């Protein structure tokens, strides 16, 4: 110890120095405590105290931070080799006072602390080890349990082997039966052989007959061959005559053409002397063209825009490459040209067209076309022919410019020339330009300022640079043009400065707005120098031509972009549905194609069209650029004007036609004569190669002929040039060219409204006609320029003017489908009845092109009362909407045209209906057919009707056109209003509508009626919503209800009787029309005929069952019908009595029906008097009566059967004088009576089952039970409601997805679910028959009506019955002395709670569940149903084992066991004697379930319902045993998985609870599900012997095994086996169990025999 102490001394650094020195010296000696001095002992004591303090500090630090310190040390933050650092850190951190003594740094104390911690860790690990050992023990126990399960498995396997052995025995028995059956099969085979032998004999006989028949056929074929030979001879002769007729007709046509040619030659020679061409070049080219035309194989001579340096080639290949070319105009005075034109017109007319080609504004001079050129032209676009169809695809406007439909592309009118087009004009009202400014100077400045769209000298728009090098001549011309433009612009700038005194142009917006007017040729070309000037200034200078500017032109955009941009810039333009010109993408650069649809029409009358030059192939009506129109005096047109599109410059037949960009392709400059153009404007426009010398000479150049320029300006819409020309003196504004086209005509034809207004204001002749008789109004109407038409009408143009062919403006507008023009003309009062020389009317024209809108306007548009005053709103709105936006006009008004007008025939005898039918225009034909006066049987000159020439679609339309739609109805005769339940039966039902056509025969009509009836019977008796077309059946197959065509008594066509197969002299159609039959009525055979077909149809009870009931009455005489209230017992009995009466009367007996209604006061004495007075009971002394008597006793349930019928049972069963019965009369006398054989007794009971003493009566009658879940009641409601739906839909069966079908299915499911739930509750007296649901309203589109009806039914019928039934059941035991009535009047609180819970569950599970209404609407209607707000959590939380104090466990077991026995599940605890264990277990589970349900419900509901739940729980626990069973049954209904789930309906309501967990717990669900759950017959084991003896009537064991209600729940086989085993084990228990159930629930005992047949006691 001295050594240890010495070893400690050097570590005491905190001791004083003297003490340290003394300790060091003492270390040399042996350490002895006794030798220490007092000071040394003090020092030692202080050292030990310091060590204790250090240890305490270490312990506290380790306790406080044991986990953190060890974690830090583990991760290397502190080293275990030096724990002193940690101690020092903790000490310094914990002690803020520096004077505190440092901790002892003795390692022993530190190690002790570490060891203490290690001990703790060791203890913890030992505890974990102990836990692991316990888990090991549990694992071993589980292994033992697994072994036990394996043993059980082996036992089950052994049992399985036993079952297999039993199955083998069954198989052996089946094998024996198979052997027996095989023997029978051999016998049958032998019989079959005999039959086959007989069949062979019959076949031999038939073969002989066939041979004879074949011989007869051979003779008949020989006769037919002879007939065919004669017919072929006749055909040959007819064809020869036809060929001869055709030759004569062709010769006549040739002669007519020669006459026309001679006439036109004379006219042309006369005009030729008047016209003096001023240029020599046209004559020169005219001669060239004559040569080219006369050669039939040459291609059309063309000038192409794309040709910049080369001369025009005269090959057809060039035509193929350049789609925008034009044939050279032939000489107007040449007979050869006229002949060629005539031939071409004949070529162009399609064979189906029944007009001549002259009828559509088509001229007479046309160049001939070689076939090769035609073929190549077709390659450029989807052209349908060489020329447009004048009657179908082309506007009948002079020149066939642009077809209104997409049948012909825009290139066709150029390359394939129909007769020349006569330029059509459009008038303008006022034109005021600057009067102070010289129009010539203004026009010149307007012209010479560059424009991006102007063509260069080769006709190319300079938007696209040429794709190849420009020739030297072209370059020279380019320089010359630039120089000319610069010079003239400078020279004219003096005259065109702003003038202060110039009046403003009214309504003219700045013309520099390129986006509005450059719709035609400007795409992507940015205009340079667009100047916006004030309205008082002259027109602004257009942009310079890119060809003349110093900036290079942008590249040529793609064609698609051109079309789109022109369409995008089309502001204020109205499309007229014209052809979209779509040339191929390989167009030469510089060519342009315009869509007429996209052309703008100026919105202001004074607004001149913006210059745009790229008008290559535009259809008629295009805006021609102002720039182009100023280039007067250029090369002449290549073709007559009307053969070109209306907007092309060459459309005017003038010697010096305006040259414009690509429609006329000028020859290269080298081929032009210097003197070809002598006009300054022409020279400056860049078209003449001699531009530079003329400009340098400084002399003025004279302008060309003013009338020619006037027409050019009008045709191309150049308002500026037109104003300049109109201001000159001496100008003839009515001058006509050689084709008769005036300036007004050209402007109107091309749709230039401003030009038309200017010309009309200048007093141009508004009705000036061309050589074919077409006026400007004709041209504007044909082209669809409705603004021009409106102007011309306003200037009193002749709206009924007829051209040479008789075409009026209305006819031309109808021909081209221009509905705006048609509307304007009709409102102006034009005559619709004017006919052409071919006999065509405007209706013919509209129908010929298939234009429905035009036809509707002609037939229905009425002339407004305000006459010719048109407002903008009226012109836009019209009388009705033709675009389909509104109702069809024919639906609102009657046609305004007469029948004669509609039926008018043309020269060939064709009416408009003929044309529409032959071309397949079904819509047009349908509109014509809506006119009541249309004669579809009208025949043409070939004796063909409209039907004969119609296409298949139109034939179908015509066949159904005059078809009579007559409803077919089924009548069941008169039903007595007093009949029970007959208020809901309809006497007549419409089953379908028959279409009777003119060609319908009586055989077809008979088949249609029979098939319609059979289909209807099949449809209403099918299981689903099958349409009449889906029902495939024939007349011989009966429907499920037994009705067929054999059930018909008679058929009336209107008021005329008719039978199937009967024929009249007239056809069915004529017969119906003559007799004005509005319906066909089928009467079914009824009781008056001794049949029950009408009863079957009225009540939907199958005919076979009704016949069985009638047979029972006839055979047994005493029959009682019973079933739930509303099962139609009284109706069935009355109809059977009526049928029986008529059968007896037909057999020669007199018969009488006596009916008595039984009530509570009906006594046996009254019944006796009834029998005696009706001669059913006759005295023994009296002889039998031959009269038949039928007694009906209704409402027998209101009286006691045993008391009422007890004395009559014996004589009723033994009807003879040998077994009399003595009855005492009212006077006290007694006499013997007996029932005779001619008396029939029928009764009705509105009860589902008999009980008590009434069962004594059962064996003396034949009973017919009308069960709700068996036929006929089960399917009656479904069939009845389906028939009601069919009647509501006029014979059509709606699809299953229709809301009406859904609401009807819901009503049907409500009835079934309601009865199912009531049966489960053990209240059969509350069951409902289908009678209450027959009045279910069927209102398509109004499902709410049905829901409201259901709420009234629930509140008025169902709720009182359920309350009464539950109260009567719950009060049977509780108040035996007071009786049921007292209990019903004063129900206890527990009974009230049970009733409310039952109503709430029934409402949610049976009624509201499955309602097709949306959830929001259903919530609104929920308040209409009474009893739906009861908190269902009370039912779920009800303590199933709560009982009164005086009750024992055995008593409860006796009460509930029978109901459990009839259930599907049986508790394993039944086999145990200790019931308290079961009760505790069930109680615990019930409380657990309640808690889980409470957790699912809302907190607010819990707070509100806690007290209510507790109070009602106590009340329920005070109730009777039946109440407890009712509540258990309610719990099982709530938790049942197969029943409808309440949570789906009312999970959002606060007062409803979920019950899902009840079914999830196996023990609890078994406990509540096995209560009163019905089972099907196959699943229930036979009842034990003591149960059988307790039944009221002796029935076999198997009969009693039938359950009350069919279960909708799946039954596991293991549970059924378990049930049977438990039944056997409990069979030795006392009989009190069955006695209890029989005494307290008689109706339940009756329900056990539900599926039993009614006739068993008497069998």
UniProtKB/Swiss-Prot annotation:
Alphabetical list of InterPro entries matching this protein: Ankyrin_rpt, Ankyrin_rpt-contain_sf, Cortactin-Actin_Reg, Cortactin-binding_p2_N
GO terms under cellular component: actin cytoskeleton; cell cortex; dendritic spine; FAR/SIN/STRIPAK complex
Alphabetized UniProt keyword annotations: ANK repeat, Cell projection, Coiled coil, Cytoplasm, Methylation, Phosphoprotein, Repeat, Synapse
PROSITE patterns: ANK_REP_REGION, ANK_REPEAT
Biased composition annotated in UniProt, kind: Low complexity: 337-348, 381-392, 1620-1634
Modified residues (Asymmetric dimethylarginine): 494
Regions of compositional bias (Basic and acidic residues) in chain numbering: 1641-1659
Primary localization: cytoplasm
Record bears the keyword Chaperone: no
GO molecular function: protein phosphatase 2A binding
Sites of Phosphoserine modification: 1520
Coiled-coil region: 119-276
Keyword Hydrolase in record: no
Function (record text): Regulates the dendritic spine distribution of CTTN/cortactin in hippocampal neurons, and thus controls dendritic spinogenesis and dendritic spine maintenance. Associates with the striatin-interacting phosphatase and kinase (STRIPAK) core complex to regulate dendritic spine distribution of the STRIPAK complex in hippocampal neurons.
Protein name: Cortactin-binding protein 2
Organism per entry: Saimiri boliviensis boliviensis (Bolivian squirrel monkey)
């Amino acid at each position: 110890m001295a050594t240890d102490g010495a070893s400690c001394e050097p570590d005491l650094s905190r001791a004083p120095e003297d003490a340290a020195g003394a300790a060091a010296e003492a270390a040399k000696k042996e350490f002895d405590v006794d030798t220490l001095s007092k000071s040394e002992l003090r020092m030692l004591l202080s050292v030990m105290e310091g060590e204790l303090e250090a240890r305490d500090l270490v312990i506290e630090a380790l306790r406080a931070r044991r986990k953190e310190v060890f974690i830090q040390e583990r991760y290397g933050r502190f080293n275990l080799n030096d724990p002193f650092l940690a101690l020092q850190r903790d000490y310094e951190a914990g002690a803020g006072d520096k004077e505190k003594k440092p901790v002892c740094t003795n390692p022993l104390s530190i190690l002790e602390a570490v060891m203490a911690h290690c001990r703790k860790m060791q203890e913890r690990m030992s505890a974990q080890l102990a836990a692991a050992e316990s888990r090991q023990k549990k694992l071993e126990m589980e292994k033992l349990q697994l072994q036990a399960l394996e043993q059980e498995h082996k036992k089950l396997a052994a049992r399985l082997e036993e079952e297999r052995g039993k199955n083998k025995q069954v198989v052996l028995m089946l094998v024996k039966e198979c052997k027996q059956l095989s023997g029978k099969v051999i016998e049958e085979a032998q019989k079959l052989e005999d039959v086959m032998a007989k069949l062979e004999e019959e076949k031999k006989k038939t073969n002989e007959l066939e041979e004879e028949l074949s011989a007869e056929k051979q003779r008949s074929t020989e006769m037919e061959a002879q007939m065919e030979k004669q017919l072929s001879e006749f055909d040959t002769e007819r064809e020869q005559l036809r060929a001869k007729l055709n030759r004569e007709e062709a010769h006549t046509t040739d002669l007519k053409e020669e006459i026309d040619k001679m006439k036109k030659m004379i006219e042309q020679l006369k005009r030729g002397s008047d016209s003096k061409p001023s240029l020599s070049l046209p004559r020169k080219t005219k001669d060239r063209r004559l040569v080219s035309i006369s050669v039939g194989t040459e291609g059309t001579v063309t000038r192409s825009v794309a040709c910049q340096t080369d001369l025009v080639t005269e090959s057809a290949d060039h035509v193929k490459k350049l789609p925008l070319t034009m044939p050279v105009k032939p000489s107007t005075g040449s007979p050869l040209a006229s002949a060629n034109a005539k031939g071409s017109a004949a070529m162009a007319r399609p064979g189906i067209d029944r007009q001549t080609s002259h009828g559509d504004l088509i001229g007479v001079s046309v160049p001939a076309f070689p076939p090769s050129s035609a073929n190549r032209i077709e390659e450029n676009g989807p052209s349908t022919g060489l020329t447009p169809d004048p009657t179908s695809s082309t506007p009948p406007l002079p020149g066939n410019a642009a077809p209104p439909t997409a049948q012909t592309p825009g290139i066709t009118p150029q390359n394939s020339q129909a007769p020349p087009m006569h330029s059509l004009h459009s008038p303008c009202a006022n034109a005021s330009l600057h009067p102070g400014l010289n129009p010539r100077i203004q026009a010149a400045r307007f012209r010479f300022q560059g424009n991006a769209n102007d063509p260069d000298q080769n006709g190319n728009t300079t938007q696209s640079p040429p794709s190849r090098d420009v020739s030297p001549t072209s370059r020279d011309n380019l320089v010359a043009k630039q120089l000319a433009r610069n010079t003239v612009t400078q020279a004219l700038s003096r005259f065109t400065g702003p003038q202060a005194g110039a009046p403003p142009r009214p309504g003219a917006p700045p013309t520099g707005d390129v986006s509005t007017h450059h719709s035609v040729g400007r795409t992507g070309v940015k205009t340079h120098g667009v100047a916006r000037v004030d309205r008082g200034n002259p027109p602004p200078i257009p942009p310079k031509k890119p060809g003349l500017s110093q900036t290079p032109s942008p590249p040529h955009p793609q064609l698609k972009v051109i079309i789109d941009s022109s369409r995008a810039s089309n502001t204020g333009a109205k499309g007229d549905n014209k052809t979209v010109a779509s040339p191929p993408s390989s167009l030469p650069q510089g060519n342009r194609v315009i869509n007429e649809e996209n052309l703008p029409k100026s919105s202001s009358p004074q607004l001149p069209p913006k210059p745009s030059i790229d008008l290559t192939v535009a259809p008629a009506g295009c805006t021609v650029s102002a720039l182009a129109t100023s280039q007067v005096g250029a090369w002449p047109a290549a073709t007559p004007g009307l053969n070109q599109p209306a907007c092309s410059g060459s459309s005017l037949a003038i010697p010096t036609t305006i040259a414009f960009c690509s429609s006329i392709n000028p020859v290269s400059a080298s081929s032009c004569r210097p003197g070809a153009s002598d006009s300054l404007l022409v020279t400056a426009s860049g078209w003449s190669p001699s531009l530079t010398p003329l400009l340098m000479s400084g002399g003025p150049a004279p302008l060309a002929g003013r009338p020619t320029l006037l027409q050019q300006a009008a045709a191309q819409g150049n308002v500026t040039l037109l104003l300049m020309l109109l201001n000159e003196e001496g100008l003839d504004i009515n001058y006509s060219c050689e084709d008769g086209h005036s300036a007004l005509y050209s402007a109107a034809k091309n749709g230039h409204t401003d030009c038309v207004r200017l010309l009309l204001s200048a007093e141009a002749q508004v009705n000036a006609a061309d050589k074919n008789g077409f006026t400007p109004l004709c041209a504007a109407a044909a082209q669809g320029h409705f603004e021009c038409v409106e102007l011309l009408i306003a200037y009193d143009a002749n709206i009924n003017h007829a051209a040479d062919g008789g075409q009026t403006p209305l006819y031309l507008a109808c021909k081209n489908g221009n509905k705006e023009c048609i509307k304007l003309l009709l409102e102006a009062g034009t005559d619709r009845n004017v006919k052409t020389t071919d006999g065509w009317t405007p209706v013919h024209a509209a129908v010929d092109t298939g234009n429905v809108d035009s036809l509707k306007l002609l037939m229905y548009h009425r002339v407004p009362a305000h006459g010719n005053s048109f407002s903008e709103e009226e012109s836009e709105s019209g009388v009705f909407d033709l675009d389909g936006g509104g109702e069809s006009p024919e639906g609102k008004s009657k046609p305004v045209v007469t029948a004669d007008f509609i039926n008018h025939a043309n020269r060939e005898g064709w009416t408009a209906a003929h044309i529409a039918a032959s071309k397949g225009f079904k819509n047009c034909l349908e509109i014509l057919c809506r006119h009541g006066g249309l004669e579809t049987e009208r025949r043409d000159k070939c004796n063909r009707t409209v039907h004969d020439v119609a296409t298949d679609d139109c034939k179908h339309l015509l066949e159904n056109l005059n078809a009579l739609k007559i409803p077919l109805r089924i009548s069941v005769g008169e039903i007595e209003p007093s009949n029970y339940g007959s208020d809901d039966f309809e006497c007549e039902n419409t089953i379908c509508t028959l279409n009777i056509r003119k060609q319908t025969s009586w055989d077809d009509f008979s088949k249609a009626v029979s098939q319609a009836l059979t289909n209807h019977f099949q449809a209403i008796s099918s299981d689903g919503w099958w349409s009449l077309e889906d029902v495939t059946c024939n007349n011989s197959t009966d429907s499920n209800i037994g009705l067929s065509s054999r059930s018909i008594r008679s058929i009336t066509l209107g008021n005329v009787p008719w039978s199937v197969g009967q024929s009249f002299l007239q056809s069915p159609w004529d017969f119906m029309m003559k007799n004005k039959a509005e319906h066909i009525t089928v009467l079914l055979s009824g009781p008056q005929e001794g049949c029950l077909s009408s009863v079957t149809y009225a009540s939907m009870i199958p005919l076979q069952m009704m016949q069985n009931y009638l047979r029972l009455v006839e055979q047994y005489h005493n029959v009682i019908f019973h079933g739930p209230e509303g099962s139609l017992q009284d109706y069935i009995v009355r109809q059977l009595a009526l049928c029986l009466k008529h059968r007896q009367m037909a057999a020669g007996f007199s018969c009488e029906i006596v009916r008595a209604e039984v009530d509570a006061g009906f006594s046996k004495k009254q019944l006796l008097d009834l029998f005696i007075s009706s001669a059913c009971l006759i005295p023994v002394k009296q002889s039998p009566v031959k009269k038949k008597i039928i007694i009906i006793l209704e409402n027998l349930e209101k009286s006691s059967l045993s008391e009422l019928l007890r004395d009559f049972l014996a004589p009723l069963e033994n009807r003879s004088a040998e077994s009399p019965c003595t009855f005492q009369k009212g006077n006290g006398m007694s006499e013997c009576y007996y029932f005779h054989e001619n008396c029939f007794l029928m009764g009705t009971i509105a009860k589902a089952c008999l009980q008590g003493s009434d069962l004594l009566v059962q064996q003396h009658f034949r009973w017919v039970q009308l069960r709700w879940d068996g036929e006929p009641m089960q399917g009656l409601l479904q069939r009845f409601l389906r028939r009601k739906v069919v009647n509501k839909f006029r014979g059509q069966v709606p699809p299953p997805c229709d809301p009406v079908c859904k609401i009807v299915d819901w009503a049907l499911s409500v009835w079934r679910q309601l009865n199912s739930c009531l049966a489960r509750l053990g209240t059969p007296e509350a069951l409902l028959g289908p009678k209450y649901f027959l009045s279910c309203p069927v209102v398509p589109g109004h499902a709410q009506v049905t829901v409201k009806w259901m709420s009234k039914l629930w509140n008025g019928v169902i709720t009182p019955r359920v309350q009464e039934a539950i109260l009567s059941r719950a009060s049977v035991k509780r108040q035996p002395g007071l009786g049921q009535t007292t209990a019903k009047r004063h129900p206890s609180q527990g009974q009230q709670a049970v009733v409310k819970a039952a109503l709430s569950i029934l409402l949610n599970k049976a009624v509201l569940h499955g309602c097709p209404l949306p959830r929001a609407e259903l919530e609104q209607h929920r308040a209409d149903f009474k009893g739906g707000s009861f908190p269902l959590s009370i039912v779920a939380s009800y303590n199933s084992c709560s009982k009164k104090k005086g009750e024992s466990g055995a008593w409860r077991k006796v009460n509930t066991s029978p109901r459990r026995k009839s259930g599907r599940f049986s508790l394993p605890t039944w086999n145990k004697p200790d019931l308290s264990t079961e009760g505790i277990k069930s109680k615990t589970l019930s409380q657990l379930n309640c808690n889980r349900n409470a957790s699912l419900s809302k907190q607010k509901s819990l707070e509100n319902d806690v007290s209510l739940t507790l109070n009602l729980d106590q009340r329920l626990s005070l109730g009777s045993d039946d109440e407890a069973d009712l509540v258990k049954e309610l719990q099982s209904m709530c938790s049942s998985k197969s029943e409808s789930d309440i949570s789906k309906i009312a999970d959002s309501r606060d007062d409803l609870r979920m019950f899902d967990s009840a079914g999830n717990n196996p023990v609890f669900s078994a406990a509540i599900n096995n209560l009163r759950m019905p089972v099907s017959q196959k699943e229930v084991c036979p009842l034990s012997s003591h149960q059988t003896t307790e039944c009221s009537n002796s029935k076999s064991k198997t009969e009693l095994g039938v359950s009350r209600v069919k279960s909708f729940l799946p039954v596991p086989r293991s549970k059924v086996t378990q049930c049977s085993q438990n039944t056997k084990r409990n069979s030795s228990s006392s009989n009190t169990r069955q006695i209890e159930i029989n005494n307290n629930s008689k109706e339940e005992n009756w329900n056990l025999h539900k599926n039993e047949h009614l006739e068993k006691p008497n069998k």
